[in-house]
Amino acid sequence: MWKLVPAAGPGEPFRLLVGTEYVVGRKNCAFLIQDDQSISRSHAVLTVSRPETTHSQSVSVPVLTIKDTSKYGTFVNGSKLSGASRSLQSGDRVNFGVFESKFRVEYESLVVCSSCLDVAQKTALNEAIQQLGGLVVNEWTKECTHLIMESVKVTVKTICALICGRPIVKPEFFSELMKAVQSRQQLPTPESFYPSVDEPAIGIDNMDLSGHPERKKIFSGKTFVFLTAKQHKKLGPAVILGGGEAKLMAEERKETSLLVSPEVCVVDVGVTNSQILGSESMRNWTDSILAVLESNNLRAIPEAEIGLAVIFMSTEIYCNPQRQPDNKAVTASTASKVRPVSSQSSTVDETIMPTAAADYSTLNVADTEIEEQTCMEIERTTSQTTRREKVAFQQAAVRENPSTSGTVNAGMLISRVNRTSGFGQKNHPHSPSKILEVDKPRECTPRQQSNSITNYFHVARKRERAEEGEETSLSKQAKLEKKPLPVSECTESSASSAWNSEKEQHGKGNNIQLGRESGELASDKTDIKITFSENPAPKKRKELDDVSEDVETLEMVFESRDLDWEEQTANGDQEAQSNKRKKRCLETKGSRTEEGNTKQREENEMLRKEEVGSVLTLEDKSKIKEESSVSIRNKLINHNKLEDDSSRLPSKLLLTEFRSLVVSCPRSNSPTMRNTKCRGQNNFKTFRKVPYPGAGQLPYIIGGSDLVAHQARKNSELEEWLREELEEQNRRAREESLADDLFRYDPNVKRRR
């Protein structure tokens, strides 16, 4: 940028823009010089023009020309122009008039390098720099005065600008500078146009963009050895600008003694550059050099440390081959910012170790498998007593609280399993095939049919408890007698008591066994024998087989009777009440230990409600076992009674089914319809439009804001070639026309007189 500085003393310089004529005069002009009588109204004219376009990006200075139009003259370096024009150079002294209007001509270099700008920003920047008399270059050199970036990123140009102490500004700085020159106001400062730092690994506060003289000699005394020509070409200029020495080590050179010096930094090839290495010998040679460095407790310097050393102005932490990177600050900070993004999609809490999370998921699968296995327990008759005891115990532990789902507390479940293992039970691992069955839907038809009886067993638990307690008040007994109870509910309550007693019997983990069941069960007499035998497997297997056979008999009875038990007649109600009274009488006769022990029964009920999940004492287990034996006996009696009274079952009942009626429209594309519509013509095709989503809407038209204007990049060489070609064609046309005129010339022209 050209400017005229007053030579007499301090004063505001007058800056000149390219392509503008500045008139120097006393009145009504751009460059006013007042209080001087020797200055004319239009004393001189100053013009700044661009030089001829060159293909190279060498620094070209605009031409400043002065033309004298004054009365008393204009002097350049003491010589008078006398109305002529002259080009000025930096340092010339110009005197307007004969008095003290003296100025010094100076040229302020303006070479700008841009980085990470789009096409529109580059175009606006070129126009502003050309008006200011500067030059825009693509690569950083020593002559560069500014680096233009929209946001600061650590690039080679950024490192070079920091080393040279040049300001890094935004593109808006030069537009504001041009406005200030045109209006002759205070120029903007580069500090107010610093771009934002776009490096999360470094941080905004840690990066100082101001000029520091110590950066110019940051690499003094150090030698950087590059193993590839690409790295040497890219980072070599930055090292040289910082006062260091950049060398390229050839593959043929085998001596590595120069690499073990503490002032020699071997630049690491890196992951991306190692993929470019072509030959196997090149990779082996690089690995051998790195092995030599490791053997001498040295390390290779990554490319990023060259930039970090310039930014933080330290070669003790960065670019130091003797310092082992024990705390990778930049890498750790980068990883800490990338890590939460990937961990947000995880459903496992990060505070839980992976092993703990895996164990937790395994426990959930195990609980689901236990629930499915125990639901199918009623239709299975297994010979492995120990395994059935374990599964039944886990079912009891899960179902003891009705509001608890399948995923109960895993710790309590494991503790119960561990406790029961001390009683001599054998833990069998679940097979993978059973675990896979958890994901299958439970709406299978065979399983619904087999488990249909289990749906009734969970309903009558409260009634069962009410019937087992003989301490029920007279008012409750009267209400129960007045309320009709079908035969199915009695059978369900007895069967549910058998099922619950079987669960409690095998789930508590002791070896209490029923001694035997004589044939006197039908005559309301049962001998209960509680023993602690060491080998109870044969008797227990026999009892379980008997119970399973009874349950299968119940299922056959329910399946053979497709009746609606909720709509019973008066005869059914009377039979239910009589069965209920007989059952209570049988319970009163059969329970030997429960007679006279009402207080103990109340205490057992309190313990059962309060101590859920705890190991019951031996006395409680024996009482529960006695209750379960009574329930089994009642179930068998009711079953026999049901077989005896099968002839008295109600008949002539009405079966009600609810069906939803749906009006179905006839198909329009049937053959008969087509024949009638088309007047009986064969092979006549009818077509119709198939609706699709969005058929009634307007189509989406790409246009407007969706289109981006294509900005073609101007090619100066092509334009110049086209211009020269056009001039050449015009010249040839003129020559041809001149030749034609000479050919038609006739010296003997006859003129008419």
Curated annotation (Swiss-Prot):
It is found in: Nucleus; Chromosome; Nucleus, PML body; Chromosome, Telomere. Residues 442-606 are annotated as: Disordered. Residues 517-528, 585-606 have a biased composition (Basic and acidic residues). GO terms for cellular component: chromosome, telomeric region; Mre11 complex; nuclear inclusion body; nucleoplasm; PML body; site of double-strand break. One of its GO terms (molecular function) is protein serine/threonine kinase activator activity. A motif (Nuclear localization signal) lies at residues 461-467. Keywords: Cell cycle, Chromosome, DNA damage, DNA repair, Meiosis, Nucleus, Phosphoprotein, Telomere. A motif (FxF/Y motif) lies at residues 739-748. InterPro entries: BRCT_dom, BRCT_dom_sf, FHA_dom, Nibrin-rel, Nibrin_BRCT2, Nibrin_BRCT2_sf, Nibrin_C, Nibrin_met. Residues 22-81 form the FHA domain. Belongs to the Nibrin family. The FHA and BRCT domains specifically recognize and bind phosphorylated proteins. The C-terminal domain contains a MRE11-binding site, and this interaction is required for the nuclear localization of the MRN complex. This is Nibrin. It comes from Gallus gallus (Chicken).
